[in-house]
């Protein structure tokens, strides 16, 4: 169980749903261990948040457990989408814990937001990668099949074709050096927030599948999550693997908790 997630399903305002998919990782595998590692390393955190004057155990968080992958990624994503959509229909905010970034496709389809906001080192705008259209490098492309707009925060690498796609009017890219000064302005739009832990510099979170230097510090990511959370109707944190001493999992778990605190306070 995610520490502090003591609510039962009927009373839950938030639901942690593990999604340990590790099917299309192209460099360092291990994202299947992400949900387990977040639950483990979150044991070290205090219950109380001084930013919002709230305790995590008072915020009606439920842990659904893990939705285990099948051999068919498309089938798995549809089942995961249904699981997350059921929580939405119950008035519960889904908090997906990956697993590779491909699980975000299920989250976005379940929430059906106007705006997709993502902290990520990569553009993820491929239509297909390595012959696979359901790949961690295609997530923003699939998100834009649902959302009207994508805001990619901290993106610093991609193919020439991806950068061409990112130059179109429905995509906003905020470079790492500008993220701290970025201010969300969504109006009445619904929002989905995804956190790929590789948005962080590898010196901060080395335990991820495709690390990319010159990234964000943890404090900047924390501020983004807190700023976006009040407008968000769904959240995920993804791409944590088991190839470090817990740095990536600690950051990811802390950002999930920051989302809950800020959303409940908003």
Question: Which residues are covered by each model-predicted region?
Answer:
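Conserved alpha-helical scaffold segments that buttress catalytic/binding sites
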Residues: 2-266
């Amino acid at each position: 169980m995610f520490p502090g997630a003591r609510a039962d399903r009927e009373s839950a305002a938030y639901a942690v749903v593990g999604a340990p998919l590790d099917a299309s990782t192209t460099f360092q595998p291990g994202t299947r261990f992400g949900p387990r590692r977040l639950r483990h390393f979150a044991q070290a955190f205090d219950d109380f948040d001084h930013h919002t004057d709230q305790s995590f155990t008072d915020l009606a968080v439920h842990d659904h457990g893990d939705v285990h992958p099948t051999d068919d990624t498309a089938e798995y994503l549809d089942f995961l989408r249904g699981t997350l959509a059921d929580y939405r229909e119950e008035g519960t905010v889904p908090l997906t814990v990956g697993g590779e970034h491909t699980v975000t496709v299920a989250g976005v389809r379940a929430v059906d937001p106007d705006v997709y906001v993502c902290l990520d080192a990569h553009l993820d705008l491929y239509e297909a990668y390595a012959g696979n259209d359901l790949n961690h490098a295609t997530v923003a492309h699939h998100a834009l099949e649902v959302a009207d707009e994508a805001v990619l925060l901290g993106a610093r690498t991609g193919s020439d074709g991806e950068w061409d796609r990112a130059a179109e009017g429905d995509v906003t890219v905020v470079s790492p050096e500008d993220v701290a000064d970025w201010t969300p302005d969504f109006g009445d739009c619904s929002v989905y927030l995804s956190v790929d832990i590789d948005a962080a510099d590898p010196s901060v979170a080395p335990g991820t599948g495709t690390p990319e230097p010159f990234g964000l510090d943890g404090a900047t990511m924390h501020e983004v999550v807190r700023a976006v959370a009040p407008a968000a109707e769904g959240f995920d944190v993804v791409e944590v693997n088991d190839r470090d001493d817990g740095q990536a999992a600690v950051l990811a778990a802390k950002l999930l908790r920051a989302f809950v605190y800020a959303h409940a306070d908003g």
